[in-house]
Amino acid sequence: MQKTNKFLKIGNKEFKSRLLVGTGKYSSLEVMQKSLINTKCEIVTVAVRRVQGLEHGHKGLMESIDWKRIWMLPNTAGCSNAEEAIRIARLGRELAKLAGQETNNFVKLEVIPDKKYLLPDPIGTLKAAEQLVKEGFTVLPYINSDPLIAKQLEEIGCATVMPLGSPIGSAQGIRNAANIAMIIAESRIPIIIDAGIGVPSEAAQALEMGADGVLINSAIALAENPILMAQAFSKATEAGRDGYLSGRLKENPLASPSSPLDGVISNN
Ligand SMILES: CC(=O)[C@@H](O)[C@H](O)COP(=O)(O)O
């Protein structure tokens, strides 16, 4: 289904920016702040567990983001089963309240038992999502690029699905484009490509394919110059969306001359 909405609509909120960003792995809070500004993002995800535990890089994080301008997307990173994820989602809602976002019921649902590839558990994700939807959360589940689980999550009331391009932090880009294309074609909710994007052109690729947004963390935070890379991702996301809306030239197995051949003076 072609989605031509001007804004990214998640639940009942609209966003101009289609680039969502993470807050982990930055060399300092100052670099993170400057990078976030350059992304022009309006949604920032925070790991509830890491913020609460004041883990490395997370002390002072809450205070360093302008929550009047940025919509918080609490995430359940570090949860390996549905029960933990539900508990952390509830804490995330309280965190958003503390930041002054009384009506924020968003949660980026991550249920990740696999420490090596950080792949999400589809059964645990579905179970947690069902409960969180019942509790009134706007649920954005992180999933493998599986069209069936994407559809099931849509049917139980998730606000988006967030299929991975490749494993978190791997910078391998979009390794599963065919499956992602199926998810995009079949969904009636926004699709946000989350994880594994390595360079801005891959963010553009996701948007060109018809994804509604991308979520980037490592490729910005761990770039040699994160502040400049943030800007590059912002431009790439916008370019990819414009490319999608413009309607691409269809691929052709044959060449097609750039100038008309009719009326050309013959050699004979
Ligand atoms: C911050 C966050 O939510 C990550 O778990 C997310 O999946 C981003 O992945 P990359 O770090 O690969 O961009």
Swiss-Prot record:
Pfam families: ThiG. CDD domains: ThiG. 1-deoxy-D-xylulose 5-phosphate binds at G169, A195, G196, N217, S218. Its EC number is 2.8.1.10. GO terms for molecular function: thiazole synthase activity. It catalyses: [ThiS sulfur-carrier protein]-C-terminal-Gly-aminoethanethioate + 2-iminoacetate + 1-deoxy-D-xylulose 5-phosphate = [ThiS sulfur-carrier protein]-C-terminal Gly-Gly + 2-[(2R,5Z)-2-carboxy-4-methylthiazol-5(2H)-ylidene]ethyl phosphate + 2 H2O + H(+). SUPFAM superfamilies: ThiG-like. GO terms for cellular component: cytoplasm. The keyword Protein transport does not apply. It is an enzyme of class 2 (transferase). It is found in: Cytoplasm. Pathway: Cofactor biosynthesis; thiamine diphosphate biosynthesis. The active site is at K108 (schiff-base intermediate with dxp). Residues 255-268 have a biased composition (Polar residues). Residues 248-268 are annotated as: Disordered. GO terms for biological process: thiamine diphosphate biosynthetic process. Keywords: Cytoplasm, Schiff base, Thiamine biosynthesis, Transferase. Belongs to the ThiG family. Catalyzes the rearrangement of 1-deoxy-D-xylulose 5-phosphate (DXP) to produce the thiazole phosphate moiety of thiamine. Sulfur is provided by the thiocarboxylate moiety of the carrier protein ThiS. In vitro, sulfur can be provided by H(2)S. Homotetramer. Forms heterodimers with either ThiH or ThiS. This is Thiazole synthase. It comes from Prochlorococcus marinus (strain NATL2A). The gene is thiG.
